[in-house]
From Swiss-Prot:
It is linked to Homozygous deletion comprising CEP89 and SLC7A9 genes has been reported in a patient with isolated complex IV deficiency, intellectual disability and multisystemic problems that include cystinuria, cataract, broad based walking pattern and deafness. Residues 34-45 have a biased composition (Pro residues). The keyword Transferase does not apply. Residues 28-49, 63-157, 176-226 are annotated as: Disordered. This is Centrosomal protein of 89 kDa. It comes from Homo sapiens. It is found in: Cytoplasm, Cytosol; Cytoplasm, Cytoskeleton, Microtubule organizing center, Centrosome; Cytoplasm, Cytoskeleton, Spindle pole; Cytoplasm, Cytoskeleton, Microtubule organizing center, Centrosome, Centriole.
Amino acid sequence: MLLGFRRGRRSHFKHIIHGLLPAASVAPKAAVPRTPPPRSPNPSPERPRSALAAAILATTLTGRTVAIPQPRQRSRSESDVSSVEQDSFIEPYATTSQLRPRPNWQSEMGRRSSLPSFETLDYGDEEDIETQLSSSGKELGDVSAREDRGGHSDDLYAVPHRNQVPLLHEVNSEDDENISHQDGFPGSPPAPQRTQQKDGKHPVLNLKDEKPPLCEKPPPSPDITGRARQRYTEITREKFEALKEENMDLNNMNQSLTLELNTMKQAMKELQLKLKGMEKEKRKLKEAEKASSQEVAAPELLYLRKQAQELVDENDGLKMTVHRLNVELSRYQTKFRHLSKEESLNIEGLPSKGPIPPWLLDIKYLSPLLLAYEDMMKEKDELNATLKEEMRMFRMRVQEVVKENEELHQELNKSSAVTSEEWRQLQTQAKLVLEENKLLLEQLEIQQRKAKDSHQERLQEVSKLTKQLMLLEAKTHGQEKELAENREQLEILRAKCQELKTHSDGKIAVEVHKSIVNELKSQLQKEEEKERAEMEELMEKLTVLQAQKKSLLLEKNSLTEQNKALEAELERAQKINRKSQKKIEVLKKQVEKAMGNEMSAHQYLANLVGLAENITQERDSLMCLAKCLESEKDGVLNKVIKSNIRLGKLEEKVKGYKKQAALKLGDISHRLLEQQEDFAGKTAQYRQEMRHLHQVLKDKQEVLDQALQQNREMEGELEVIWESTFRENRRIRELLQDTLTRTGVQDNPRALVAPSLNGVSQADLLDGCDVCSYDLKSHAPTC
């Protein structure tokens, strides 16, 4: 039964290639250029090309994903071979349309998360990982077989950065397994295990040789376990009630945000209607002006307009490219790690002469794809190692329980003092305890499912809100552009109106013209003031929404961290409680045995003392009789001699009894000393375990510090990118100003320079908004 259960658990994680293929095929626009990279005519013989790098480069260039052929499997037993043959076989170099995922893979995709952030990945331990790879490659024969098949392992794109786990051969199992002794954190093995691996002695548990005694792990008493369960159930209920209250608060916040979004939509619709009315009025004015200004059409103005439109189009194209590059770079930097300095220096394959190609210098072209693949492989290996460790511990526990049951049955057979009624009562109590355990586990599973469902619903709502915010921002940008164009057209119309005034002095009266112009100016001022007020209100609402979005993201992250911490605390408390209960019961049994031994020794000594007193009384009585006989009858010497002989024999018997009592007392004292030594050894073991746990905590703290350093480096790179984009925008602005000033100096400079400057300032404002929104988006996940 144990082997079948283990094989069923292992079959879920056979092929991890299904989780990696969609990531390469989903990307809409790859960062790698379409043209293939230049190949050197004489490649170096030390570092041949990797099949993995070629496959990934082909997928990025053509868009057709290719399945990577599986490596040669290591030696397994018959049970593993049979389980592998039952699984599906992936043909080498098959497309993703031919690869259909299984339900097991779907369940695993549902369980696992996307990609870990910088806080959970320990990227700082790369040098330790490389040293472990070199040491484990010397010890294991299977790894050497893979290296012979794959060629040289020094290629950067072919060497995976995942931890290779040493093989530990179990004695009782039928097949070989990779067992990594990991305490809580899969990337940080403890120091004592490293010393054992260097000496060549792996920590193997011989299940047949080491038989724990009955007194080490007895079954827990029902009273203690019931009280502990009641306490834990009360604690968990309180925590879940607090989480429910927080969920209600978040739901209320989401409802208020939806109401505000609806109001924003209504305001945007009203603004669109007003803009449509303004456009209609402007069209009418344009038609009237065209009818009047057909005679005064100038080709220079048309040429300048074309140039300005071309510059605006080029500026928009550059903005879009910069935005896309920023988005792609932020996505890679949030999901994948950077190359270290040593890795970036050790990149070979560049031509020895001539300029260096740009597709090998930049981080965002090819290396992130390989690093992402290696990170996924690391995660899968760590998951396999943790599952194997859990299965080993489960097997050990089951075997211990079986041994304890066998010993208990033997004791029951030996001491048949237990009646059938007491045995039935014990069985009923055990059944009740098992039913209570099942009910509690079901309740915990239901609560965890509810928490997961609520978390997914919140994530969906947050994604919807972010999409709506993006749409609103895009609409506002479009409306701002339209407003800028309308203002430029209004200024052009004003200039034309002034020219028409000079031409048509005698046609229209000055007073009538002034009144019309004043009315138009007042209308324009009113409309501009209304638009400014509406724009200020919209900007204030957008800032409020962004602040609320940040607060919601922070609250969501805090809630997820609290849930994880609570789950970890529950597991730790349960483990500690189990261990303490087992230790208490073992100590109780040992104390009871010691008390029984002491009582038996006391009874034996009391019996010996009573015998000695009886013998002394008999001796005294005989001495009195002898004196009386000597005083009364001097002739009865023979009887006195016989009585003396009897007294000597009795004294010898008393001496023998005393010697036996002394020997038994020595045995009892020797046993007590042995028990004290056993207790001292156990205390030393517990102290070693405490030191080991302290060291593991130190390792985890170092990993967290390294993750924080990487986050700071990421922020520095983002600041550099922002400065570069700001400089490019400034350069484009200066070019626009120079071109517009050159072209506008000849005819009517005031009428042309002002609209161009207004357009540039508003474009700069749009650029600033884009950069601010990008900064918010890039810093939001890091928080």
